[in-house]
Amino acid sequence: MQICLIDETGTGDGALSVLAARWGLEHDEDNLMALVLTPEHLELRKRDEPKLGGIFVDFVGGAMAHRRKFGGGRGEAVAKAVGIKGDYLPDVVDATAGLGRDAFVLASVGCRVRMLERNPVVAALLDDGLARGYADAEIGGWLQERLQLIHASSLTALTDITPRPQVVYLDPMFPHKQKSALVKKEMRVFQSLVGPDLDADGLLEPARLLATKRVVVKRPDYAPPLANVATPNAVVTKGHRFDIYAGTPV
């Protein structure tokens, strides 16, 4: 995959070249999307819209730390949707990991989560965020146990992941209407890189065959059900719903 690669670390140690080789990235000076290694982290920038800033994965500080400490925990909609109850903490495959937010929330309340991400740039961002998270004194211990990244296409990986999870979670890219600055900024940069999930409808059936208990699909409230398969079961929040489908028991 081609992207503009920029090293702002000033160390000259070739770390960016190693990273590019690992994820199969080729430097393209004219690409509007840039993957930038800063002294702090790896980030994605849209070069023709510098005001949008850089997008990076941060499990330790910022919004994710606030959500972990002051969010709803088990009361969050995603936790309810996957079926967390009492001692039951399902094993989850997040087949559309993105920036890992929902996966992190589930891991923070005790679930083991395997994140699938097919885009090599997004996978590199997730891997960078995980490395910093694993090294953190406060969350590193449980994060290493509960949150993992698998760089693979969901459409193929969903048929051969072992062991089978109890829950498969899907949050395919869907055009957003929200006006919130953060969503607009992230979605604009993100969609410039990966585009809409045009094959997302094809995820539902393999997900249902893989999950032993249920499949949860996050949708904007205005979006039709995935693959146009309606379900009466959903957790509804302001702006979103989490559609719930039966899996395939062992």
Curated annotation (Swiss-Prot):
Swiss-Prot/TrEMBL keywords: Cytoplasm, Methyltransferase, rRNA processing, S-adenosyl-L-methionine, Transferase
Assigned GO CC terms: cytoplasm
EC id: 2.1.1.242
Subcellular location: Cytoplasm
Residues the entry annotates as binding S-adenosyl-L-methionine: R101, D102, E117, R118, S153, S154, D171
Reactions catalysed: guanosine(1516) in 16S rRNA + S-adenosyl-L-methionine = N(2)-methylguanosine(1516) in 16S rRNA + S-adenosyl-L-homocysteine + H(+)
Enzymatic class: transferase
Keyword rRNA processing: yes
GO molecular function, one term: rRNA (guanine-N2-)-methyltransferase activity
Record InterPro entries: 16SrRNA_methylTrfase_J (IPR007536), SAM-dependent_MTases_sf (IPR029063)
Statement: the UniProt record of this protein carries the keyword rRNA processing: yes
Main location: cytoplasm
Matches recorded under Pfam families: SAM_MT (PF04445)
Family: Belongs to the methyltransferase superfamily. RsmJ family.
Function text: Specifically methylates the guanosine in position 1516 of 16S rRNA.
Stored PANTHER family: RIBOSOMAL RNA SMALL SUBUNIT METHYLTRANSFERASE J
Protein name as annotated: Ribosomal RNA small subunit methyltransferase J
Protein species of origin: Escherichia coli (strain SE11)
Gene of this entry: rsmJ
